[in-house]
Swiss-Prot record:
<dbReference type="GO" id="GO:0005730">
    <property type="term" value="C:nucleolus"/>
</dbReference>
<keyword id="KW-0067">ATP-binding</keyword>
<feature type="domain" description="Helicase ATP-binding">
    <location>
        <begin position="150"/>
        <end position="325"/>
    </location>
</feature>
<keyword id="KW-0698">rRNA processing</keyword>
<feature type="binding site">
    <location>
        <begin position="163"/>
        <end position="170"/>
    </location>
    <ligand>
        <name>ATP</name>
    </ligand>
</feature>
<dbReference type="InterPro" id="IPR044773">
    <property type="entry name" value="DDX18/Has1_DEADc"/>
</dbReference>
<dbReference type="InterPro" id="IPR001650">
    <property type="entry name" value="Helicase_C-like"/>
</dbReference>
<dbReference type="Pfam" id="PF00270">
    <property type="entry name" value="DEAD"/>
</dbReference>
<protein>
    <recommendedName>
        <fullName>Probable ATP-dependent RNA helicase ddx18</fullName>
        <ecNumber>3.6.4.13</ecNumber>
    </recommendedName>
</protein>
<feature type="domain" description="Helicase C-terminal">
    <location>
        <begin position="339"/>
        <end position="509"/>
    </location>
</feature>
<comment type="function">
    <text>ATP-binding RNA helicase which may be involved in the ribosome biogenesis.</text>
</comment>
<keyword id="KW-0690">Ribosome biogenesis</keyword>
<dbReference type="InterPro" id="IPR014014">
    <property type="entry name" value="RNA_helicase_DEAD_Q_motif"/>
</dbReference>
<dbReference type="GO" id="GO:0005524">
    <property type="term" value="F:ATP binding"/>
</dbReference>
<keyword id="KW-0378">Hydrolase</keyword>
<dbReference type="Pfam" id="PF00271">
    <property type="entry name" value="Helicase_C"/>
</dbReference>
<feature type="compositionally biased region" description="Basic and acidic residues">
    <location>
        <begin position="593"/>
        <end position="602"/>
    </location>
</feature>
């Protein structure tokens, strides 16, 4: 195998100082508190050149469970300027080929066995006002899930749809749902005719935004009820009459049980989106109660990226005896979206943050999402990066709803930027033009990996890249990804090109009380999340070197924390941790934040 060498670049490494006049606008309130401390900021070295898009070596295509990892050195990255020029030329060519057709090529007539004309939205037997909205939104041709779902749904049939994230499910269920309301001449006094259930608040907001666009030429009312928002205004709107309602499960059940003016006796259609995700996050009991409380004489649409036992159970109690099944991905050889270049990098624990810092610093002109495993890890990483002049946004499950909503839309509307988040952003959200998905902490399983990378390369002809961080001992995870039909390449980031700012990082954390506590909580949350990993044969918490793990959080030695992990790892971890005398214990004594039992919240 031929290795391509990159010419070494000689760069100086001046110290970095923070100018108050250029402070990033995305700095969090917590970061501002950090900046108010009397301690001086770390003199972080400027990184050396690092190519943002490495060339790759393909995993060998062999009929074995574990992909063959060759001993030869992976191909080193090409020059960034050449790649950017190639990207620009490719984008220009794609724009010319599009010919003002946003969806050309979504689905072929041959694939569906129908005429060329019938795959266009304009030929659907729906209201002209809906067609007008669809045209203004820029859609012309249907995706496979839309072409196979909309007509049966317009006929009033129940449907179980299975399609990967980013396949166009939202329009597939909204168009028939709106048609039901219009044909029934629904008025506010009739109450709610359509209920759409979403697993997360952000996805609910996004679905509601699309519904609002589709309904702008119709007289029917629409609304949204989600956890975290004020309940009283929701009650008032429901009592006035909301014909199409988007909701999260917990808040919907609350209103069904307690809001007297919430009329659902005329319900025509119940839509459950991302059903597998709804059940994964613990809403199984709520879903069964909701289904019992809504009228049985209704149309039901259930969409799920994966078919699990729990999804089957919900399908049995919610769908009629002969639902239509639509699965557009059943024969696909690759589980992830097309146009997605995926890779992994093998990086030891102590160099993880250095590589992340270097990568982000080099790609400030890109739009990047970085996934971490816990709220505390997101909080600390965002605070630290903002503190050292890498502006980032943070999104996780412990933020107040208004903060989450504002952050989400700020990133959606940004042309470039970095979002540090938990898996709260990993399902269904449509964030345009994301260049990179970085999985800094490992996903729990291949299914979660697929949902994470589904945030990029969304839409026809779109491109995106994904990078998975793995420790050397975690390479066995590749066999699970291969079995899940996920093609991966190995990326190499030469050690000489990674910014060596470890000393400065440790100085920042040790000299700043607020950052130290945040880092300590993140360190603890990382280990506890690792201990709860489902693939314990690969992600063995007892095999972690705490000394190396601590370095990635800015510690010279592991801090003293009470690690509440499972019984098999508890004693071992307490022994390892207590053998290390963290420097902060000497500095701050017992001034540690109170225990937080929600460090796993996502």
């Amino acid at each position: 195998m031929v290795s391509t060498k990159v010419k070494p670049t000689t760069t100086t490494t001046p110290t970095t100082t923070v100018n108050k006049t250029t402070q990033p606008t995305t700095t969090t309130t917590a970061s501002k508190k950090v900046k108010q401390t009397k301690q001086s900021k770390a003199q972080a070295k400027e990184i050396q050149e690092l190519a943002s898009t490495p060339s790759v070596k393909q995993i060998q295509s062999q009929k074995v469970l574990v992909p063959k990892l060759e001993e030869t050195k992976p191909i080193t990255p090409p020059d960034q300027e050449e790649e950017d020029q190639e990207e620009e030329e490719q984008e220009q060519e794609e724009e010319e080929n599009e010919n003002n057709d946003n969806n050309t090529g979504n689905v072929s007539e041959k694939e569906l066995g129908i005429s060329k004309e019938s795959i266009e939205f304009s030929n659907l037997p729906i209201e002209e006002n809906t067609k007008k909205s669809i045209e203004e939104m820029g859609f012309k041709k249907m995706t496979p899930i839309q072409a196979k779902s909309i007509l049966p749904l317009l006929e009033g049939k129940d449907l179980l749809g299975a399609a990967r994230t980013g396949s166009g499910k939202t329009l597939a269920f909204l168009i028939p749902a709106i048609e039901v309301l219009v044909k029934s001449n629904f008025k506010p006094r009739n109450g709610t005719g359509v209920i759409i259930i979403s697993p997360t608040r952000e996805l609910a907001l996004q679905i509601y935004g699309v519904a609002r666009e589709l309904m702008k030429y119709h007289t029917q009312t629409h609304g949204i009820v989600i956890g975290g928002a004020s309940k009283k205004p929701e009650e008032e709107r429901l009592e006035k009459g909301v014909n199409l309602l988007v909701a999260t499960p917990g808040r919907l059940l609350d209103h069904l049980q307690n809001t007297k003016g919430f009329i659902t006796k005329n319900l025509k259609c119940l839509i459950i989106d991302e059903a597998d995700r709804i059940l994964e996050v613990g809403f199984e009991e709520e879903m069964h109660q909701i289904i019992k409380k809504v009228p049985k004489t209704r149309q039901t649409m259930l969409f799920s990226a994966t078919q699990t036992r729990k999804v089957d159970d919900i399908a049995k109690v919610s769908l009629n005896n002969s639902p239509v099944y639509v699965g557009v991905d059943d024969e696909r050889e690759i589980s992830t979206v097309e146009g997605l270049e995926q890779g992994y990098v093998v990086c030891p624990s102590e160099r993880r943050f250095l590589l992340l810092y270097t990568f982000l610093k080099k790609n400030l002109s890109k739009k990047i999402i970085v996934f971490l495993s816990s709220c505390n890890a997101v909080k600390y990483t965002a605070e630290l990066l903002n503190y050292i002049d890498i502006p980032v946004l943070e999104l996780h499950g412990r933020q107040k709803q208004q903060k989450r909503t504002n952050t989400f839309y700020e990133f959606v509307n940004a042309e470039k930027g970095i979002l540090i988040c938990t898996d709260v952003a990993a399902r269904g959200l449509d964030i345009p033009s994301v260049d990179w998905i970085i999985q800094y902490d490992p996903p729990d399983d291949p299914k979660e990996y697929i949902h994470r990378v589904g945030r990029t390369a969304r839409g026809v002809g779109k491109k995106g890249r994904a990078l998975l961080f793995l420790l050397p001992k975690e390479l066995g995870f590749l066999k699970y990804l291969k079995l899940a039909k996920v093609p991966l390449n190995e990326y190499e980031f030469p050690k000489s090109k990674i910014a060596n700012v470890q000393d400065q990082l440790e100085k920042v954390v040790s000299q700043n009380f607020y950052l130290y506590n945040s880092a300590r909580d993140a360190y603890k949350a990382y280990i506890c999340a690792y201990a709860s990993h489902s693939l314990k044969d690969i992600f063995d918490v007892n095999a972690l070197d705490l000394q190396c793990v601590a370095k990635a959080f800015g510690f010279l030695d592991p801090p003293k924390v009470n690690l509440n992990v499972n019984s098999s790892g508890k004693a071992d971890f307490q022994k390892k941790s207590n053998n290390k005398s963290g420097f902060a214990q000497k500095q701050y004594g017992s001034k540690f934040p109170p225990k937080d039992g929600r460090q796993f919240d996502r």
